[in-house]
Amino acid sequence: MAKTIVVKQIGSPIRRPADQRATLVGLGLNKMHKTRELEDTPSVRGMIRKIPHLVEIIEERG
């Protein structure tokens, strides 16, 4: 089974640059305090690293 991480949106995309909003959509997050379980890949880690002020890693599984 692949490693996964659980990510929670903690910041609002309002008044943020378009690329940061697009990164949130790419992670599957579109509303405050929603969580998403994602596969732990370098691309997902890079997206999280791009918007650390908007997301929080809740848990790492695997």
Curated annotation (Swiss-Prot):
Part of the 50S ribosomal subunit. It comes from Ruegeria pomeroyi (strain ATCC 700808 / DSM 15171 / DSS-3). GO terms for biological process: translation. It comes from the Bacteria. This is Large ribosomal subunit protein uL30. One of its GO terms (molecular function) is structural constituent of ribosome. GO terms for cellular component: cytosolic large ribosomal subunit. InterPro entries: Ribo_uL30_ferredoxin-like_sf, Ribosomal_uL30_bac-type, Ribosomal_uL30_ferredoxin-like. The gene is rpmD. Keywords: Ribonucleoprotein, Ribosomal protein.
